[in-house]
Amino acid sequence: MGRGGRRNPGRPRRGSLAFSPRKRASRPVPRIRSWPDEERVRVQGFAGYKAGMTHAIMIDDWPNSPTEGEEISVPVTILDAPPMYVAAIRAYAPTPDGYRCVTEAWAEIPEELEMDRVFTVPKDGEAGDLDKIEELVDEGIVEEIRVIVATQPKKAGVPKKKPDVMEYRIGGKDVRERFEYAVEILSEEIRAKDVFDEGEIVDVSAITKGKGFQGVVKRWGVTIQDRKTQRKQKGRHIGSIGPITPSRVRWTVPMAGQVGYHQRTEHNKRILKIGEDGEEVTPRGGFVNYGVVRGDYIMIHGTVPGPKKRLIRVRPAVRPPKNAPEGAPEILYISRTSQQGVRPKASEDEIVEQLGGPASA
């Protein structure tokens, strides 16, 4: 007999065990454990805060698409992506257990960044210096160069002062070139346009929206028992947690518990636009539950995990599609209609323009 019940013994089990254990993420900043191999020397990723969604009209440029060359309406997600501050360089050496950090060099952290809210920032000389890293690079001991960066939420629309600190790999083939680039951007701000190109395929990682403690029906998708099968008029539970022998409950049995607030990565999203003026994409009245995008932004085709104001990490795709279009797409229109449920009164110039007449000077 299969894994199913008495009525349908051959059906697959309810829910997936691939994401076990389904527990809360340890912190709101997702971890990136793999990086793409590429020749371009750059910081392999950026981070922004999810502002909301809207829609855009663009020319479909995917090869062999049924609507290739035609206008299509697509959903887009707006990430509020203020510049990030490069705070430190880390050098990694290979060991039998993987890469291990051998030393790091910190820049002078500006007080307005308020990184002391996160941890005690190392003083000069406490955690190594650039000369030591350079020696290890010349000796061939160091094979991996990464940078520690911090977001600047004060420049975004999120109500927080504490920066989010994370680590990004420096891409490239030659370790010396990667180290020199890291030294060049140390103690400097990097922007989204310095990392990504419009039209690039990327992966996005985030912590999903938390749902709290939920039962087995919502958590695992088990069937609600019918009226005659229920015990004590309660049908939102599993019929059996296992046989008498073995006298233990297996870990695969659906149980109630945490739903949401898990780290998830969605692959092969496309960056449609990178801009410097958030007014270009902010709806009238601002994004609901977020506000106004004031500066740099990233517009991604489709959805990304997490609620509004959640940190979203973006990196170059590790397995990009082979037929992906190259270059920036042609965007004809970005919807800025109010999401507040209130339609603003059109100005005289807008009315004249809609009627086809010349606008006033």
Curated annotation (Swiss-Prot):
Disulfide bonds: none annotated. Signal peptide: none annotated. It holds the Pfam family Ribosomal_L3. Keywords: Ribonucleoprotein, Ribosomal protein, RNA-binding, rRNA-binding. Residues 1-14 have a biased composition (Basic residues). GO terms for biological process: translation. One of its GO terms (molecular function) is rRNA binding. PANTHER family: 60S RIBOSOMAL PROTEIN L3-RELATED, LARGE RIBOSOMAL SUBUNIT PROTEIN UL3. Part of the 50S ribosomal subunit. Forms a cluster with proteins L14 and L24e. This is Large ribosomal subunit protein uL3. It comes from Methanopyrus kandleri (strain AV19 / DSM 6324 / JCM 9639 / NBRC 100938).
